[in-house]
C-alpha cells in the first residue's frame, strides 16, 4: 500500500516541474481560493476562467459580495450553471461578515460551518490558503486514489467514500499541503483521465497498484448508469397586448429562491402531464403559478437541455394575456419587460435561447 513518503515527494516534484498557470493560483487569498473552488465544482477550467475574472473584478472581497443583491450575484453567474453555488456564496459571505468580522475561518472545521461549504471545499481552502494538512476528495482525486491502491469497491457507496477520505487524510503531507492537494487534483484532470489514463506521463506510475496489475481502466468501480428521465416542459411568452412585437411587453417570473435554479428569471410554464396537450399544459401551469388567464398562440421554438439527473425538451409558445392580476402562487416575483430591458435579469440558458429566438424573429433589444 503506497504511503505518504511514497507519494508526496513524487507529486510535488511533478508539480514544481510545471503546473497550469491559472488566475486563482497566483494568490493565496482565502476568499479568492474559495470562489475558484466553488466555481470549479462540476465545471471545466476553461469555462470558469472568464467567470472568475469578472467575479473578482466585481466582488474583489467578502464585503463586496455580502453587500451585493442576490439579483446582481445571479446575473454575474448567469450561464455558469448550478446556481445554488452562487446563492450559497452570497449567503456565506453575509455569514462571514455577521459572524466572523469579515474574515474566513482559518480551519477546515470552521469553514464547514459556512453555508454551502462541504468537506472538499473546506479542505481545499484550508490547505491552500492556511497550510492546514486537510484532505480533499473530488471526482478527480477519487479516480487517482482508487487506481493508486487498486480499490475494487464501488466508489459511490458511503463506506467506500469514507475509506477514500481516510486514505486522502493519511497521504496529505504536513509540508506544502496546498500544493500537494492542487497537484493531486491536476493529476486527475490532465493525466489520470477517466477513459484513457496517460500512465506513461504519470509521476505515480511506479507506485500505482492498478498500473502494476493492469486494472486502471476498471478503476474507480461504479454501478451501471441509470436511464436519464426525460420531461416535456412548456413556457409562454405572454404578451400584454396579445400581439408579439419588438417593443411589446411580455411577462417573466422569478423562480422560488429555495428550489432548482432558485432566484433566476424565466418565461412562466411547467411540466406537461400525461395525456395533456402542450397548449393545455401551458394554460394550467400559468393558472397554478400566477392565477391569470392566457390564450396560447403560435409555437416559437423548442429547446433541448440536459441537467445532471434529467433531460427536458422545452416548448415555447407565444401567448396573449387575457386577464387577472398575477399572484405569486408558484413564483417569487414577476415583471413585465421588453426586449430592450430583459438583459438586466438573470436567466438560465434555456430561457436565454428563447430570448435569442425572439430577437431573431422580431428584432429589437
Indicate where each model-derived feature is located.
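Acidic, metal-coordinating catalytic segment for phosphate/diphosphate chemistry
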Residues: 203-234, 306, 313, 342-361
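NUDIX/MutT-family hydrolases
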Residues: 318-362
Amino acid at each position: 500500500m503506497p504511503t505518504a513518503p511514497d507519494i508526496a515527494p513524487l507529486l510535488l516534484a511533478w508539480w514544481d516541474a510545471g503546473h497550469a498557470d491559472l488566475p486563482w493560483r497566483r494568490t493565496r487569498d482565502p476568499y479568492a481560493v474559495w470562489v475558484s473552488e466553488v466555481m470549479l465544482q462540476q465545471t471545466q477550467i476553461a469555462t470558469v476562467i472568464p467567470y472568475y475574472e469578472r467575479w473578482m473584478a466585481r466582488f474583489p472581497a467578502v464585503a463586496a459580495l455580502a453587500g451585493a443583491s442576490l439579483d446582481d450575484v445571479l446575473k454575474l453567474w448567469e450561464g455558469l450553471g448550478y446556481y445554488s453555488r452562487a446563492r450559497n456564496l452570497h449567503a456565506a459571505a453575509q455569514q462571514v461578515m455577521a459572524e466572523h468580522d469579515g474574515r474566513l475561518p482559518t480551519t477546515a472545521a470552521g469553514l464547514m460551518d459556512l453555508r454551502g461549504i462541504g468537506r472538499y471545499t473546506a479542505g481545499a481552502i484550508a490547505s491552500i490558503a492556511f497550510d492546514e494538512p486537510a484532505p480533499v476528495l473530488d471526482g478527480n482525486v477519487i479516480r487517482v486514489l482508487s487506481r493508486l491502491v487498486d480499490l475494487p469497491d464501488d466508489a459511490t457507496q458511503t463506506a467506500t467514500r469514507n475509506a477514500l477520505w481516510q486514505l486522502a487524510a493519511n497521504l496529505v503531507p504536513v509540508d506544502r499541503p496546498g500544493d500537494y492537494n492542487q497537484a493531486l487534483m491536476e493529476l486527475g484532470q490532465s493525466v489520470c483521465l477517466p477513459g484513457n489514463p496517460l500512465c506513461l506521463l504519470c509521476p505515480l506510475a511506479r507506485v500505482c497498484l492498478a498500473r502494476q496489475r493492469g486494472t486502471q481502466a476498471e478503476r474507480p468501480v461504479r454501478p451501471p448508469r441509470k436511464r436519464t428521465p426525460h420531461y416535456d416542459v412548456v413556457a409562454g411568452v405572454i404578451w400584454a397586448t396579445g400581439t408579439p412585437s419588438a417593443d411589446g411587453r411580455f411577462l417573466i417570473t422569478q423562480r422560488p429562491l429555495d428550489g432548482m435554479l432558485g432566484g433566476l428569471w424565466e418565461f412562466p410554464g411547467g411540466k406537461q402531464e400525461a395525456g395533456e396537450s402542450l397548449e393545455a399544459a401551458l394554460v394550467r401551469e400559468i393558472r397554478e403559478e400566477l392565477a391569470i388567464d392566457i390564450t396560447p398562440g403560435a409555437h416559437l421554438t423548442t429547446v433541448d437541455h440536459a441537467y445532471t439527473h434529467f433531460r427536458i425538451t422545452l416548448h415555447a409558445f407565444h401567448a396573449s394575456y387575457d386577464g387577472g392580476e398575477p399572484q405569486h402562487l408558484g413564483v417569487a416575483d414577476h415583471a413585465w419587460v421588453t426586449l430592450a430591458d430583459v438583459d438586466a435579469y438573470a436567466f438560465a440558458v434555456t430561457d436565454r435561447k428563447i430570448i435569442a429566438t425572439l430577437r431573431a424573429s422580431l428584432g429589437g433589444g
